[in-house]
């Protein structure tokens, strides 16, 4: 690539960072870092009605948590918010008006709605009907004077050549083209309140910031021909466009929707649950891109080195919560204990479980945790009531050999002094019980696990027994034997 690579992530401060937007930011980040280019953050805040207080800070904070850094942003550069760039937009709107490539439109919202209703009834795609069509200069002047007298604020529309073909070679999807007659007619570039529309402002910004590549979701494909109209009108070279496929829910096969409350979709949600940022970074990087091969766990450095825009998928990317949980578990169990302990600390404190056993319990359950907040549920056995047994667990306890195995193991545990109730001393008791009773394998350790912990699954059994303590374990075994 001969041109300096400059890409941008341009969020609107309208809420929390969504998985889909995080992917857009991440792919732009990987693309820039792989090619030694610039990654730019720009805030698109022209939609004042949807503006959320603190939305910008939240976006940047969550991007940082994911591990992204950037070269330019509103934090370091002036006029990187659209609301700060209004004079620049006005300059180019005035230029287009002066050149006859744009014009004031006085049609009211009610008139536009009536036009669209007629078009819909006739089976015609909605498009703007030029209000000046067929008017003489005098008629046009009279029409404008009448509208001004009624205090109707105009919008500014850009003229679209309906016979033109707007096409580009998409980085992801290949050749795409639109006929000028299929993009809705002359469209608004400046609203009644004086603010530019998205499709106009984004072109001015991308040109002004020398953006070389625009990588975004394929919901923006329909915006691209409109933006090309502006590039043509102003005589500017357009950047290369790439439109990533949508993200679908792996269970429903439908587009991931913010209304789907059964799926966590905001980065903030994963932060609050104690997911590891490295895992989320890794997972999102594979939503619609794959370096090839079977490997799925990659460091940030590996992802930057391997990233290839030519391997962006043309098929929808499946968001699989179970896959994400598996990946986070891989990161947690392989992370330094100190890091995992720090991650679990807020949850232990909130549950009033940050006591002398906290470190040992986190160490015990680190291999099992899919997110740090699970530490509370996993440690319930040590602080709450004995769990309700499943039917399968009850069936195992009802086995013919269970009473002998449990009573023998209990007797051996009872002989251990409190000071010797350690993993090193508990571990040999399983073999001793097997030797004495002839009960072995699953028929030995599974009933003991169920009786001691109330579960058929869990961390290493000797460690669990040692941490539960002699008194509690003996009480649990007695309860099982007396049923």
Swiss-Prot record:
A motif ('HIGH' region) lies at residues 11-21. One of its GO terms (cellular component) is cytosol. Keywords: Aminoacyl-tRNA synthetase, ATP-binding, Cytoplasm, Ligase, Nucleotide-binding, Protein biosynthesis. GO terms for molecular function: ATP binding; glutamate-tRNA ligase activity; tRNA binding; zinc ion binding. It is an enzyme of class 6 (ligase). It comes from the Bacteria. GO terms for biological process: glutamyl-tRNA aminoacylation. Monomer. Belongs to the class-I aminoacyl-tRNA synthetase family. Glutamate--tRNA ligase type 1 subfamily. Catalyzes the attachment of glutamate to tRNA(Glu) in a two-step reaction: glutamate is first activated by ATP to form Glu-AMP and then transferred to the acceptor end of tRNA(Glu). NCBIfam families: gltX_bact. This is Glutamate--tRNA ligase. It comes from Lactococcus lactis subsp. cremoris (strain SK11). The gene is gltX.
């Amino acid at each position: 690539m001969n041109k300096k690579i400059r890409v941008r992530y341009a969020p609107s401060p309208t809420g929390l960072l969504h998985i889909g937007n995080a992917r857009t930011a991440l792919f732009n980040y990987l693309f820039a870092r792989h090619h030694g280019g610039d990654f730019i953050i720009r805030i698109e805040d022209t939609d004042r009605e949807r503006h959320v207080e603190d939305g910008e800070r939240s976006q940047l904070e969550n991007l940082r948590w994911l591990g992204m850094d950037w070269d330019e942003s509103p934090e370091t550069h002036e006029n990187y918010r659209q609301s700060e760039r209004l004079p620049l937009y006005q300059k180019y709107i005035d230029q287009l008006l002066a050149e006859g490539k744009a014009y004031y439109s006085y049609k009211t919202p009610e008139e536009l709605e009536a036009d669209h209703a007629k078009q819909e009834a006739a089976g015609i795609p909605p498009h703007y009907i030029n209000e000046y069509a067929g008017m003489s200069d005098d008629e046009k002047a009279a029409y404008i004077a009448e509208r001004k007298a009624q205090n109707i604020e105009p919008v500014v529309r850009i003229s679209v050549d309906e016979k033109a073909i707007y096409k580009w070679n998409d980085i992801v999807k290949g050749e795409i083209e639109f006929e000028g007659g299929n993009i809705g007619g002359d469209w608004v570039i400046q609203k009644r309140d004086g603010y530019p529309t998205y499709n106009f402002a984004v072109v001015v910004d991308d040109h002004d910031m020398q953006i070389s590549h625009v990588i975004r979701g394929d919901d923006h494909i329909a915006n691209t021909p409109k933006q090309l109209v502006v590039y043509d009108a102003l005589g500017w070279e357009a950047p290369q466009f790439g439109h990533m496929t949508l993200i679908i829910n792996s269970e429903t096969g439908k587009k991931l929707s913010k209304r789907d409350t059964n799926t966590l979709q905001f980065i903030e949600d994963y932060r609050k649950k104690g997911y590891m940022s490295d895992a989320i970074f890794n997972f999102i990087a594979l939503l619609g891109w794959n370096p090839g091969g079977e490997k799925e766990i990659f460091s940030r450095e590996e992802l930057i080195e391997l990233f290839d825009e030519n391997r962006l998928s043309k098929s929808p990317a499946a968001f699989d919560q179970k896959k994400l949980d598996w990946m986070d578990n891989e990161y947690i169990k392989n992370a330094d204990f100190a890091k995992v302990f720090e991650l679990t600390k807020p949850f232990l404190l909130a549950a009033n479980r940050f006591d002398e056993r906290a470190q040992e319990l986190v160490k015990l359950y680190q291999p099992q945790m899919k997110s740090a907040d699970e530490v509370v549920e996993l440690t319930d056995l040590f602080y709450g009531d004995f769990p309700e047994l499943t039917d399968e667990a009850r069936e195992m306890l009802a086995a013919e050999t269970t009473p002998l195995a449990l009573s023998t193991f209990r007797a051996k545990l009872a002989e251990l002094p409190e000071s010797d109730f350690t993993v090193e001393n508990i571990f040999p008791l399983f073999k001793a019980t097997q030797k004495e009773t002839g009960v072995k394998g699953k028929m030995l350790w599974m009933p003991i696990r169920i009786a001691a912990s109330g579960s058929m699954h869990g961390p290493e059994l000797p460690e669990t027994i040692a941490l539960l303590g002699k008194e509690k374990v003996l009480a649990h075994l007695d309860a099982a034997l007396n049923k």
